[in-house]
């Protein structure tokens, strides 16, 4: 049954194609643009380069943009809002809650910073703020207020609870989970939705298991899942995607290149999940390259299009550093891929 549902979806994709986002009443473009690189993720990005990148995304027909207070410690929301407020056409905006951008002041001291993630290179263009995790009722409401100011819009389409889960928080997960569930974080999001301040909410995370848990606590409309439904990681297809469909929760998929290995040439960068790729992943990727070569399909194109073959997925997000990369991603996204290619991947056990 799942195969039939997948094969009914036409694979001649357009980046500008509008898709219904679950029950939110929103339509998003099949290809969305994430803004983390604009905050100086891994390397500095000038204002001129950031503006050019956003304009290239708009010019490519993209009308769904994702940001977060964390990205550049507020910088990305400023940049995105400045661009979108000048456009005659409304785009869909998602941002996130769970982190507040703040500093010490008279009458307020900040808690100690959590242990630094060794994989986190920091923000080369970040604003001069510190991030403080706060998933409580007041924290969510303040985060929404702050994002309104940075983006310059009185309403925000979607709010994702950012990085809740053990992958980010480790031993402190229960503390933050209790703030979200018992401390009113989900209640705040529900109130914002009921008042029309947002159209929907969900989680923005790197682990599908925490979205599954959250569905037991709140009525999620849409969630952003990074790196956990791809050509190299499909555990969620059986364990989670059917639940999302049953609960009427739309999905946006990010991290389709799994930290770069699926966009790199054969023998190039071999990073998977922010670390050196294990041997079994390299073997699987090389076999994907073999089949892609046989059908004259760029592996990056297959990686981008694969998640959208499942009807639970409404859109994918890309994060790029230049207008040229946006244009290349659009070419990959719109590449014609024959059904025989996907059938070959299935026969080899590379997709289900």
Where are the predicted features?
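Short, solvent-exposed loop/helix junctions and linker helices
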Residues: 133-137, 234
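N-terminal binding-site loop/beta-alpha segment at the start of enzyme catalytic domains
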Residues: 2-114
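Short, acidic/polar
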Residues: 44-57, 136-150, 206-213
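Short, well-ordered coil/turn segments that N-cap beta-strands
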Residues: 26-31, 61-63, 88-91, 153-157, ...
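Structural preference for long, well-ordered alpha-helical segments within the folded cores
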Residues: 56, 64, 146, 150, ...
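Beta/alpha (TIM)-barrel catalytic core signal, keyed to glycine-rich beta->alpha loops juxtaposed to Asp/Glu
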Residues: 13-15, 49, 83, 145, ...
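Short amphipathic alpha-helices and their capping/turn segments at secondary-structure boundaries
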Residues: 14-24, 77-92, 140-155, 238-250
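Charged, glycine/proline-rich intrinsically disordered loops and linkers
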Residues: 104-131
């Amino acid at each position: 049954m799942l195969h039939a549902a997948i094969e009914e979806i036409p694979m001649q994709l357009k980046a500008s194609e509008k898709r219904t986002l679950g029950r939110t009443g929103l339509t998003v473009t099949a290809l969305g643009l994430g803004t983390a690189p604009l905050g100086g993720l891994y390397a500095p990005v000038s204002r001129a380069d950031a503006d050019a990148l956003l304009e290239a995304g708009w010019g490519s027909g993209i009308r769904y943009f994702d940001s977060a207070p964390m990205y550049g410690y507020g910088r990305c929301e400023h940049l995105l809002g400045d661009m979108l407020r000048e456009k005659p056409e409304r785009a869909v905006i998602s941002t996130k809650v769970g982190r507040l951008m703040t500093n010490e002041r008279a009458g307020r001291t900040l808690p100690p910073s959590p242990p630094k993630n060794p994989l986190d290179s920091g923000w080369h263009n970040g604003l001069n703020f510190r991030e403080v995790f706060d998933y409580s009722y007041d924290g969510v409401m303040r985060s929404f207020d702050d994002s309104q100011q940075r983006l310059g819009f009185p309403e925000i389409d979607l709010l994702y609870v950012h990085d809740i889960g053990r992958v980010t928080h480790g031993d402190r997960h229960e503390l933050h989970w209790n703030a979200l569930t018992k401390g009113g974080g989900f209640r705040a999001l529900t109130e914002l939705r009921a008042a029309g301040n947002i159209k929907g909410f969900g989680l923005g995370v790197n682990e599908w298991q925490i979205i599954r848990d959250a569905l037991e606590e709140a009525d999620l409309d849409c969630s952003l899942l990074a790196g956990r439904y791809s050509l190299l990681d499909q555990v969620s297809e059986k364990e989670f995607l059917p639940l999302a469909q049953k609960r009427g929760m739309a999905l946006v998929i990010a991290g389709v290149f799994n930290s770069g290995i699926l966009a790199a040439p054969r023998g190039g960068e071999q990073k998977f999940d922010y670390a050196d790729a294990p041997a079994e992943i390299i073997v699987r990727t090389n076999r994907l390259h073999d089949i892609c070569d046989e059908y004259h399909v760029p592996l990056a194109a297959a990686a981008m299009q694969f998640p959208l073959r499942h009807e639970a997925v409404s859109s994918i997000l890309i994060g790029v550093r230049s207008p040229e990369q946006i244009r290349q991603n659009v070419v990959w996204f719109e590449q014609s891929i024959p059904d025989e290619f996907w059938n070959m991947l299935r026969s080899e056990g590379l997709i289900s």
